[in-house]
């Protein structure tokens, strides 16, 4: 059966106390609405309608995509009114209504919900709540059949004792929706057009209201303030930690680990505390990541080791390579197999060949370093002249003496050597020693200045 999805994202979110529209507040570095859109896409609908209102231009600009249609709700008159704004765009056999501030809803849950929908049956997602305050209550008859949803403010004392709450997520037969929305009334405590009133209409029209239960409260929690936003973040991170551990990853402490993107992992990976994985990260078998590391949009090949307090962004580490502690690999950096980058070494758009080493205290930018070459402490590639960047190219088995400055553009042939403290401004042929420093002069009988 064909499917249209409507995502309600027009709310202001005053309790966030923020100029940013509520649905753009992030969970795991992605807007809450972005998570919901990703889940919607996984269901392969024929259209996704996003109903926006408060901060509409900002929301549209942030999340615009070819497969999204944004619909304006000029006045926030309730959830039923919001869905009605999208009606002209809906033509599928089934319509699923989601919420832009409920980012943890799972694809599998929604698939089960959609399986309930037929011409004479709709699907309602409910949840068992420890404290249902504020939630609409699911009212059933003596045989357990759903009769209506009663909003908290309109509920009687007896109805407020019900712990089964409405999540707001609803899947309905598309051909029925326009009729139901057209019959909504705002005669209630809020003076709004409640989407939940559709349930009583469906029952009156002879349809069955089938229910699917969410796994837990967190899956359907919406973020109305920053406290709930933090709860969502914590739950998301624990969910990701469990998934990675199930795939063969050892997390030293799952409560001190963050995923903020897409992560692919191999087996027997070990990750220490306070590690952040951002963007698209690929981690192969037997990789070890030390504490306090940030790894973004990077690839770690089999057996790579990232030592404590290192930062990788857009980098690739070859099989058996290692870096750190306190290493920084910036975009375009690539370490060959068994290459070594030590403490306080920064690479930017630099490629190190197999077995090459830069042990400590160096900046290597816009550079190509051949296999087995050794970079002495304090080496700098001087790649910027104030207007343009230039490359430094080293062959294989090159030895760079400590505290050398390589002024690009410059090339060093295979097995070239530079003396410690040299400033290299021209190419060095293969098998050649380059020494570029002032001759030492000793002054005998030198007396240090004294204070006056």
From Swiss-Prot:
* Gene Ontology biological process terms, A to Z: cell morphogenesis; cell wall organization; lipid A biosynthetic process; peptidoglycan biosynthetic process; regulation of cell shape; UDP-N-acetylglucosamine biosynthetic process
> What is the recorded name of this protein?
Bifunctional protein GlmU
Q: Does the keyword Protein transport apply?
A: no
Tell me how the cofactor is bound: Binds 1 Mg(2+) ion per subunit.
As for family, the record states: In the N-terminal section; belongs to the N-acetylglucosamine-1-phosphate uridyltransferase family. In the C-terminal section; belongs to the transferase hexapeptide repeat family.
Please name the source species: Ectopseudomonas mendocina (strain ymp)
Q: Where is this region: Pyrophosphorylase?
A: 1-226
Select a single GO molecular function from the record's annotations and give it: UDP-N-acetylglucosamine diphosphorylase activity
Sorted alphabetically, the Gene Ontology cellular component annotations on this record are: cytoplasm; membrane
